[in-house]
Amino acid sequence: MSRIGRLPIPVPKGVQVQVSPGLVKVKGPKGELSVPVSPELKVVVEENVVRVERPSDERRHRSLHGLTRTLIANAVKGVSEGYVKELLIKGIGYRARLVGRSIELTVGFSHPVVVEPPEGITFEVPEPTRIRVLGIDKQKVGQVAADIRAIKKPSAYHEKGIYYADEPVRLKPGKAGAKK
């Protein structure tokens, strides 16, 4: 049995889980998400717990078991609490500002870069050097944060670029220089 797959998913108050063939809909205070489920797996909703069961110990079923359980758990957390990914901007003159719903990045190019949020994603800029990406879909929040980071990846030699807040800053040593 998959160690992750067999764990029950606690459903907080205010969150509803509906199971239909091939789909699990999760509705909560922050919104609604649907998770596709393989027809081979069985999703059981009890009072305030959701369980995923698999028909056999085939490799394919074991893989789908843990994956499906995690996707449903992420959806439950997303509609109840939401997800946040924080980015830091480092570099002289590098900054971000909120323009309507989108953000405008000044990161060393000859022009500012404007990033439009996809549906279900919002941006916050608490400081000119910090960006917060918020949403209920974990995958979408992570992808948008990765797209923003890719605009100006962290430099290997200088502490410049867009970093995840929890990302360690790794700098390579520069040239050793000529000895006298």
UniProtKB/Swiss-Prot annotation:
Oligomer status and interactors: Part of the 50S ribosomal subunit.
One annotated GO biological process: cytoplasmic translation
Pfam families, sorted: Ribosomal_L6
GO function terms (MF aspect): rRNA binding; structural constituent of ribosome
Domain of life according to the entry: Bacteria
Keyword vocabulary terms for this entry: Ribonucleoprotein, Ribosomal protein, RNA-binding, rRNA-binding
Origin organism lineage: Bacteria, Thermotogati, Deinococcota, Deinococci, Thermales
Protein name: Large ribosomal subunit protein uL6
Organism: Thermus aquaticus
Described purpose of this protein according to its UniProt entry: This protein binds to the 23S rRNA, and is important in its secondary structure. It is located near the subunit interface in the base of the L7/L12 stalk, and near the tRNA binding site of the peptidyltransferase center.
Record-level GO cellular component terms: cytosolic large ribosomal subunit
InterPro entries documented for this protein: Ribosomal_uL6-like (IPR000702), Ribosomal_uL6-like_a/b-dom_sf (IPR036789), Ribosomal_uL6_a/b-dom (IPR020040), Ribosomal_uL6_bac-type (IPR019906)
HAMAP family linked: Ribosomal_uL6_B (MF_01365_B)
Family: Belongs to the universal ribosomal protein uL6 family.
